[in-house]
Amino acid sequence: MIRANLLAAAAGAILVATPAAGQLARADRTKLEQAVKSPARTPANVARDRYRHPAATLAFFGVRPSHTVVEIFPGGGWYSEISAPYVLGGGGTYYAAAPDRALSGFRRLQGVNPQLYGKARTASFPARAAGEQGVPDGRADVVLTFRNVHNWLMGEQPYAELAFRQMFAMLKPGGVLGIEEHRLPESAAAAREMSSGYVKVSTVRRLAQQAGFRFVGSSEINANPRDTKDYPEGVWTLPPTLTLGDKDKAKYSAIGESDRMTLKFVKPR
């Protein structure tokens, strides 16, 4: 009950700035809390809740158990362990969307626990080649992407604009795009977005709005003022990666996971 009240209070604080955000019915908030507290979650993932604030983040995005939800690049399934059972258990539909080779982590979840994840669907994202099965256009109520935009900007063939166009296409009119991403100061050199793992809020907003999205609001639930964003190996210097190994491990562990933007967009009706 205490955690549920804290979640409601957090959502209320967010709503001061963004009235359309976080308005989950009491029953949905309860189901979300149950998904977060599920004993089926990996203990190492549970330990990171203090950095990632999954209940408050999903409430801010307004994810309901009856929704059709697409998670872009779910990776090893950190959020999938919460959002997939929450949605599938409430009569909704859950898609894990990524290139086929990047869906191995999610498929492992399905193999280990088919009761929880067996009804989930997979789709190719971004769908580029003929015959690739992406999420059908106009299907999703909510599209979620956590810590992925920086990858779409980096490398020899960046595809951020394509990714945002396809996310826009898969949403229903009125559908929500929720983004969590490592946050680069607006005063930083733009070139750092290509190597540090951090991205400017203005860059994410530009990409979304170019694709047709309308910005709804932001939350500071995933902010971390201890993150100075000036590390030798970029954001991967911090937990959970700690790419420098034991070198200054205590220092970087004390900082915690990165400072992150949490942004909500809507596909206009």
Predicted regions and their residues:
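Conserved class I S-adenosyl-L-methionine
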Residues: R64-G75
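A short glycine-rich, Lys/Arg-flanked "PGG" loop and its adjoining helix->strand segment in the class I
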Residues: L88, Y159-P173
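A conserved beta-strand element that flanks and buttresses the S-adenosyl-L-methionine
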Residues: L144-N148
